[in-house]
Amino acid sequence: MNTNHRRIKINVSWKWGLFFFLMSVAFSSCIDDFDVKKLQDTPRLVLYCFPTEGDTTLIVVTKSLPVSSFKGDIDTQSRLPVDASVVYKVNGMPQEVKRIENIKEAQSFSQVSDSWFLSTLIGQYYAVGKQKAGDKIEVQVSADGLSEVSASTSIPEKVDVNIGDIHLKEKSSDHDVYFSVDKLEATFSDPASTTDYYSVKVTRKQKYGNLKGVPKEGNRWQYDVYANNYQDYLNYLGREDEYEWCFDSLASNIVWPEMVTTSEPLINKKSELDDDFGFDEYKYFDDVYIFNDRTINGQTYTMHLEVNSNDSYWHTYDGWDRLFGFTYNVQLCKVTPEYYRFLKSINDAQSNSWADAGLMQVTPTYSNVKGGFGVVAGFNVCEASKYIAPLPSAPSDNQGGIYTK
């Protein structure tokens, strides 16, 4: 499956909906995740929609293809949009639904300029209308020759999250992990009156690219120079009388570092039984870590999150974080039960080494779409960030730093 979208930067109001559009594309050809018996009859509509607070909601409509009789490139054909009538309601009131007509319009949904990525958006739909936490969302889709489908969800209240201490380049709590980790504390308060579902993700924003040096007036070397990495920049130090450094020539990038789950009980799914049989540990799709409040209901709880240090500032993107620092971001997403069940079914399927060995049945991907496939599921995200100033020099593997509240 194509997961090259993992580092795409997306406009805030659509970023999670667009992320799940890409996820639906990635899974559109993975027929083992669905009920194969249903896929063997006539084509059915496939609907994906992930409403949240804001004024624009992406609606993805494709169709399933009968695996027993279809001839051709099923992977490509299953990604194509469908000419359909789409009704989107907020608290029973229909909202305006538009269609993405061209690359230029698709570009408004993303800062990504990749033509293939943008082409996957053409022909899809989006609803325009303000919506907030507590709103009920209904989606109905009909198309010629296909049965009508419908689904409903709601937008949950967001839960605030705060970043506490951050410890850099420490030994992981998992004895099987050979790399150093950065340890983050993230605190939130779970509502006591409801059963709640969440996802958490850690990202890191950092500089990358070539640093441009422009000759000062009178410099006999009349051409620009470029520091390709932090070491190159150090080599130019001492020549400040010759060059002006254009620090805005560097771009910012967002990465999703690998997370070690054993330090946090809410997301730790590592099984000693799996270890005994040599099976892989639990896999979270696209580094979105889901959990529920069964063990923490009504509590103010601090998550202890570990991410791979070696994905980051001392090795990745040429070491510019030694000069500029970087920013950690924690995204805590309050999700609806259908959102949680959908992601959990994907995680369970891709983590089921017992099924791969023929010892257990594969569970189909969850769907709440009546008459078809896919999912309509609401969410609400809260983010917290903490800037990490550059250390004077690169620490060794047993030398780290702590950034307090």
Question: Where are the predicted features?
Answer:
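N-terminal secretory signal peptides that target proteins for export/translocation
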Residues: 1-12
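Sec-dependent signal peptide recognition
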Residues: 13-20
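C-terminal motif of bacterial Sec signal peptides marking the signal peptidase cleavage site
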Residues: 26-29
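A sequence/structural signal for flexible, mid-protein segments enriched
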Residues: 31-405
